[in-house]
């Protein structure tokens, strides 16, 4: 299944076992469905959750805020950048200070300028761990150190995602 393929009857079995293979399975763009899921979470005793999407996979942060308000569940947002393949154009030339400035701006002014401030930093690392991703990882670690926010690293789930390299850098 290719990453740009849509969910179909022909590939649904593969996708159910490997739901990260296509962007279509990760597109949570129906606030009503999302709100029901969060309400079910609350009914099961949940009180807080971390919404871990960052640029590259981030949805509508305003909808997330509305869902949190409507359900009474605390939702902690996240800043950072996802895997290389999903990077916004500016990231391809960014240096450590640029990544840090981006994260600090979201921390201080809110995610995408909304005033909704993140409580965590997340970095996605691709298979093969590119040099630019190392810059991003170092920037995220420094930003976490300076701000006191927790850092989550999402290494590639296939072989070659670099967890040992990541640990050495951190």
Give residue ranges: language-model regions.
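Acidic-and-aromatic substrate-binding clefts and catalytic sites of carbohydrate-active enzymes
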Residues: 54-60, 129, 158-161
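Short catalytic-loop micro-motif centered on adjacent basic/acidic residues
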Residues: 48-53, 151-155
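Active-site gating loops and adjacent loop-to-helix segments of metal-dependent hydrolytic enzymes
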Residues: 1-28, 79-97
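Divalent metal-coordination and catalytic microenvironments
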Residues: 1, 49, 144
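Catalytic pocket-lining loop regions of alpha/beta-barrel enzymes
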Residues: 141-170
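A short acidic, amphipathic alpha-helical/loop segment
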Residues: 60-64, 169
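Catalytic domains of carbohydrate-active enzymes, especially glycoside hydrolases
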Residues: 35-50
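Active-site gating/metal-coordination segments in enzymes
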Residues: 66-70, 74-150
